[in-house]
Amino acid sequence: MRYALLAASIFALSAHAHADTLVDNIKGETIATDGSLQTFSALLFDDGGTIKAVYGPGARLPKQGRNGYQYHIDGKGRVLLPGMIDAHAHVIQTGFALLTLDLSDTVSLDDALDRIGKFARAHPDRPWIIGSGWSQDRWHMGRLPTAAELDRVVPDRPVWLERADFHAGWANSAALKAAGVTAATVSPQGGAIDRLPDHQPAGVLIDHAADMVARAVPITKARDLDLALATAEADFARRGITAVADMGTSLGDWMAFRRAGDGNHLYMRIMAYAMGTEAMAAIGGSGPTPWLYADRLRMGGVQLLLDGALGSRGAWLKLPYSDQSGTSGTPLWSETQLGNLMSRAAMDGYQVAVDAIGDKANATLLTTINDLTHTYSGDRRWRIEQAQVTDPANWGLVAEIARTGGVVASMQPAHQISDRVMAEVRLGPDRLRGADAWNSLKHEGAVLAFGSDTPVERPDPWTGIAAALTRQDDAGAPTGGWQPQERVDRLTALTGYTSAAAWAGFAETKFGRIAPGLRADFILVDTDPMTATPEAIRKTKVFQTWVGGGKTYDAEPEPVAAKSGTKH
């Protein structure tokens, strides 16, 4: 029922255009083909949702009528921008995070346990308690939580809670038992089981070890995936996001996207990157899929994970962690395995996107890409996802790859805000110069595509733009910005969430800018990101979101006008 209501509410807003529609009385801004800022005062799109014309200030507009446009949208003097694009998102996980137990705002272990207990009591019919968003760093614990602590509030059924970075999970004793994880269980390659002094599993499983519990969770039903997608779509639309790069698309995710498209309720554009080469082959077969549903869905690439997260000390570093000298992190693949997987995808024409967090992971990935460019030439647009900690000594490889097959630094400005204090502890002062090095990587020739990694962070492009400009959190800390030399300018920030994010997914001929021939994906907002203060940008209000000439979100819905020539 909830899915039906969500779908119906969006469908009511998403009526398609019938004949040409003029949007005027706007302050329009978009990125031009040469990368500069282009301003305009009106645009015209057709009944297929494609932009026909863009009019500069003072230009003569067409007339309404039989030989002109039929419908009119009054922009009310608001700012019109291309729809925002989240260059690194997890669509279905975002929906589930909104539907299940959310621990992202808990401030202590006791706070989390209280929330977990209340949630379990409120849902006595759920065979498992599922949730996400916890972080021992945010709780200032200095250690990982345990199964015994979970057992105190939910002793009667399994509990599985993924960490905020989704690179670790916290299980109670019932979940460990259901998964068969015992003192005798060996940690898999690319994973680790946190253990008690007697070698019993303590409760947290990291990276590939977490898969053991995840596989024991009851299989998600198709209707649950559909509800998660509809929930995520509504959340993206209200934030002004019209397209995403969905990283780690499973076959089940893909089928949910296809069901939505077949049912005419896929209300945003999804550039899908399959989770590993097996899912890639299952979805696309011998090559990327074509664009489907009027350019709303395509699987054109594969996502591979090279290491774990910095917060759970899974990120692969060149030197040991500053706060735990016994480990340098966990590579999930050997260098040979990584090269083979990337080659397997590249030979069939798939775009390759690899998550690399630590400086050793990034150095290994850059070397591997550079080697592969000799075999796989042409416009490849190799994607480095996260690129959280890089070694300046390796930046020269970025420039070399940029000259050959092209390289995308797909980065998440909000991570810098939430991870700053933790990164200082994990890395120590000597490695911070290469942390979230947006400006330096851009200078070396990488194309910056910005996203959120939702549900790890909120899919809020306005927080991301403000963070990219200032390297400060919402409270303005730290003064002057963290590693301020890595701040980017306003044009780069806006480009990162629009045209560059489209280019990063080989979609620049479809959407990402306001230009004739591209899809009419746009938003009306109250704030101009090219002139407003960072504080104002963070508070940006989205009034309307349009995808392919159809409205998918309206903050101020009005009754349909009696005159056929007016659109709301």
Predicted features, each with a name:
Residues 227, 342-353, 360-382, 386, ...:
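His/Asp/Glu-enriched, well-ordered alpha-helical/loop segment
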Residues 261-264, 288-294, 374-377, 398-406:
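Acidic (Asp/Glu)-rich catalytic clusters
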